[in-house]
C-alpha cells in the first residue's frame, strides 16, 4: 500500500480573530484523516493555546502586527502541526520549570499565572517540540487512532 501524505499551509495575521479559522481548518484536516472526535478536540485546544500565545506574546512590541504560519502535515498514522512566528522569543525550559507540576490539592486562587497553555499543549498532544531561533516555532504531533467505520462491501440496489 502506498503511503499518503498531504501538506497544508496557512499564513494569518497575528490576531485573535483568526483563532476560530485555524480551529475550523484543523477540524477539517483531522476529520479528513479519520481522527476520532476526542483527538480533534484535543488538537483544537492545543493549537488554540499555541496560536493565542503567539498573538499575545510574539508581537506585543509591534502592536500585534505580524504573521503566524501554520502547517499541517498529514501522514499515515499521525498529523504534525507546526505553528511559527517571527516575534519575540522566550526561554521554554525556564517557563516550563515555573509552571508545574500542579498539585491537585492546591487552592485554585493560588495557582501560578501563565504557562498553563504550554502545560495543556504538552498534555493533549503526543509529541511537542519548541524551537526559538528567530521567533518561536512549536511542533506538535498527534497520532491518529482512526474511527472504526467498517467498509460495507455489499451494495444493495434500490430501484
Curated annotation (Swiss-Prot):
Keywords: ATP-binding, Kinase, Nucleotide-binding, Serine/threonine-protein kinase, Transferase
Transferase recorded as keyword: yes
Cited InterPro entries: Anti-sigma-factor_SerPK, HATPase_C_sf, RsbW
UniProt keyword Lipid biosynthesis, yes or no: no
GO molecular function, one term: ATP binding
Catalytically driven reaction(s): L-seryl-[protein] + ATP = O-phospho-L-seryl-[protein] + ADP + H(+); L-threonyl-[protein] + ATP = O-phospho-L-threonyl-[protein] + ADP + H(+)
UniProt-listed Enzyme Commission number(s): 2.7.11.1
GO biological process: negative regulation of DNA-templated transcription
HAMAP family for the chain: Anti_sigma_B (MF_00638)
Biological role stated in the UniProt entry: Negative regulator of sigma-B activity. Phosphorylates and inactivates its specific antagonist protein, RsbV. Upon phosphorylation of RsbV, RsbW is released and binds to sigma-B, thereby blocking its ability to form an RNA polymerase holoenzyme (E-sigma-B).
Family label: Belongs to the anti-sigma-factor family.
Protein name listed in UniProt: Serine-protein kinase RsbW
Amino acid at each position: 500500500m502506498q503511503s499518503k501524505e498531504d501538506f497544508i499551509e496557512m499564513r494569518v495575521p497575528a490576531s485573535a480573530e483568526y483563532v476560530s479559522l485555524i480551529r475550523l481548518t484543523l477540524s477539517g484536516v483531522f476529520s479528513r484523516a479519520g481522527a476520532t472526535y476526542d483527538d480533534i478536540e484535543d488538537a483544537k485546544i492545543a493549537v488554540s493555546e499555541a496560536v493565542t500565545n503567539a498573538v499575545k506574546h510574539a508581537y506585543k512590541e509591534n502592536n500585534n502586527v505580524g504573521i503566524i504560519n501554520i502547517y499541517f502535515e498529514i501522514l499515515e498514522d499521525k498529523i504534525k502541526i507546526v505553528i511559527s512566528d517571527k516575534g519575540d522569543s522566550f526561554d521554554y525550559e525556564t517557563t516550563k520549570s515555573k509552571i508545574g507540576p500542579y498539585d491537585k490539592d492546591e487552592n485554585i486562587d493560588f495557582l501560578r499565572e501563565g504557562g498553563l497553555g504550554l502545560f495543556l499543549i504538552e498534555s493533549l498532544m503526543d509529541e511537542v517540540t519548541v524551537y526559538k531561533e528567530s521567533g518561536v516555532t512549536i511542533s506538535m504531533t498527534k497520532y491518529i487512532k482512526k474511527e472504526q467505520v467498517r467498509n460495507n462491501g455489499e451494495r444493495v440496489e434500490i430501484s
